[in-house]
Amino acid sequence: MDTQAFKQTLHKSDRYNRRGFGSANKRAQALAEAYQSGLIGSIRENGNLLEHGRLKVKLAEAFGFCWGVERSVAMAYETRKHYPNERIWITNEIIHNPSVNDHLRKMNVLFISEEKGVKDFSVVKDGDVVILPAFGATVQDMKLLHDRGCHIIDTTCPWVSKVWHTVEKHKKHTFTSIIHGKYKHEETLATSSFAGTYLVLFDLEEANYVSDYILGKGNREDFLKRFSKASSAGFDPDKDLQKVGVANQTTMLKSETEEIGRLFEKTMLQRFGPAQLNEHFLAINTICDATEERQGAMFSLVDEPLDLMVVIGGFNSSNTTHLQEIAISRGIRSFHIDTPERIGEETNTITHMPLEGGELLTEENFLQNGNISVGITSGASTPDRVVEDVIHKLMKIGENF
């Protein structure tokens, strides 16, 4: 499919909307009423510090809702107001935050079901309204909805759209897109649908494996088996790794994306020489400003003396997981929770998701005796009001134990 031509057709349609229905001021007011927190505002004014009895809370300099998430959530709320009687669907969670998605369900926004990675669009009818979430949607899903006569409300984060433009540029110049991301993640699925030939790499270890293959040190059968689910159809590592460009899932760890980019630049330089480097490697920065800012703030926070860390965000939130990864890498006792209810203020316990995933774990004697310093941050999909509720629970434990 000519994805650029399709996007031009879609954007000209009177059944497509990516600008919302009201002014930016109205959107900001609606979100403030729903999600902002007076307590968080006060803590920010006090240098991101709260002292309450034996408890000291330190907030990261930057955390919580980014502007892309704010825009997406506000547009989803506006959609229900603009279409009070129509059936409204959303192709996935609007963002990776359970409280926000539950609020949409209460507004009678319907979520398209998915089984084994396949969405059931049979429930969507001509004239229905369909919201595309902040992560975007695959170009194939967009075309299906457009052809069906749906009203499409596109809340895709502009930073995600920027990555789509990047991989389309790779495709135009016959470069393979090396996408740093999780191949099952909604955003990466959408991005890869706009690419031509692509390979999704989860981390630096996988990038080094591919680099070695480019330099003649790998095994073709092993390569194809390892990346069978993370590459474009018919991917041929002997042919398709001659020209590469790097892009990323916007929520990945910034430092790792940069390191992967440098690795492939060095690899292609070694393979083809400086005179031909630009013919075989294309470097474009697709790192999201908000992701970079929040990760930078987290690195600063973990440099301070902390007894423990609480990271708040959806368990399926990539950007939240990477914030937790930063704390764990510094040896800090750190807990990833998705809602305030994971903290038992009457029992001094916390139920959390370990970094490696799997089953939830419950920690006894969560806040230990004596004065204690707690660092707090949250993912880009977590409202300030949720962070406030977590702090209130910590304060109660500090008072009672």
Swiss-Prot record:
Cofactors demanded by this protein: [4Fe-4S] cluster
Entry note: cofactor: Binds 1 [4Fe-4S] cluster per subunit.
Pfam family, one: LYTB
EC number from the UniProt entry: 1.17.7.4
GO molecular function, one term: 4-hydroxy-3-methylbut-2-enyl diphosphate reductase activity
Top enzyme category: oxidoreductase
Entry's transmembrane regions: none
CDD domains: lytB_ispH
Gene Ontology annotations of biological process type: dimethylallyl diphosphate biosynthetic process; isopentenyl diphosphate biosynthetic process, methylerythritol 4-phosphate pathway; terpenoid biosynthetic process
Pathway this chain belongs to: Isoprenoid biosynthesis; dimethylallyl diphosphate biosynthesis; dimethylallyl diphosphate from (2E)-4-hydroxy-3-methylbutenyl diphosphate: step 1/1; Isoprenoid biosynthesis; isopentenyl diphosphate biosynthesis via DXP pathway; isopentenyl diphosphate from 1-deoxy-D-xylulose 5-phosphate: step 6/6
Binding site for (2E)-4-hydroxy-3-methylbut-2-enyl diphosphate: 96, 185, 250, 317-319, 381
The reaction(s) this protein catalyses: isopentenyl diphosphate + 2 oxidized [2Fe-2S]-[ferredoxin] + H2O = (2E)-4-hydroxy-3-methylbut-2-enyl diphosphate + 2 reduced [2Fe-2S]-[ferredoxin] + 2 H(+); dimethylallyl diphosphate + 2 oxidized [2Fe-2S]-[ferredoxin] + H2O = (2E)-4-hydroxy-3-methylbut-2-enyl diphosphate + 2 reduced [2Fe-2S]-[ferredoxin] + 2 H(+)
List of residues binding dimethylallyl diphosphate: 96, 185, 317-319, 381
Annotated residues for binding of [4Fe-4S] cluster: 66, 157, 288
Family, similarity comment: Belongs to the IspH family.
NCBIfam families assigned to the protein according to its UniProt record, in alphabetical order: ispH_lytB, PRK13371.1
UniProt name for this protein: 4-hydroxy-3-methylbut-2-enyl diphosphate reductase
Species for this entry: Prochlorococcus marinus (strain NATL2A)
Taxonomic classification: Bacteria, Bacillati, Cyanobacteriota, Cyanophyceae, Synechococcales
Gene expressing this chain: ispH
